[in-house]
Design a protein with these regions (language model features):
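N-terminal hydrophobic targeting signals that begin at the initiator methionine
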Residues: 1-2, 18
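Short loop/turn and low-complexity linker motifs enriched in small/turn-promoting residues
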Residues: 16-158
Length: 158
């Protein structure tokens, strides 16, 4: 009787597999399922058990992405993802005294800095001697450089 139960459990666990296809733009992204690398996108015909799973996507030049998926008991699940590109954004100040703050999280005082930012809108605040100098939304949609300097009127000017 024990052998029959074990065999029945094995058959049920094998039968409860779902075929997973993972499509990613851009192609060639590394696909990691529950901490295990399962290939480069597109991944076709990978067997998974129903339940919750974590998919992580990685590719140079793109922001890594993690997604939680709930796999239902079905024959096939096709998961489509689009990764967000990264852009090189440079910030430069022509004089000392500037403090930069990005998204309320990252702060620096360097006169030159190069950041890789995920595509999209980012809030940039610039302070000069601890006074707000500039507050704007920077859209990362290409590689670009921002140069900051204070306006100083010439002596004797009106």
């Amino acid at each position: 009787m024990k052998q029959i139960l074990i065999l029945q459990f094995f058959v049920v666990s094998v039968m409860a597999q779902v075929t997973l296809d993972v499509k990613v733009l851009p192609k060639g992204a590394t696909v990691i399922l529950d901490g295990k690398e399962i290939g480069s996108a597109p991944v076709k015909g990978y067997s998974v058990k129903p339940g919750g799973h974590e998919i992580r996507l990685e590719k140079n030049g793109y922001a890594p992405a993690t997604h939680e998926i709930a796999v239902q008991d079905a024959k096939r699940l096709v998961a489509d993802f689009i990764m967000n590109p990264m852009y090189t954004i440079k910030f430069r100040s022509k004089e000392k005294g500037f403090t930069f703050e990005l998204n309320g999280e990252h702060t620096w005082r360097d006169e030159k800095i190069k950041l890789n930012l995920e595509a999209g809108a980012h809030r940039l605040r610039v302070y000069y001697l601890d006074e707000l100098f500039d507050d704007q939304v920077v859209v990362a949609d290409r590689n670009v450089e921002f140069i900051y300097t204070r306006y100083q009127p010439e002596p004797g000017g009106n």
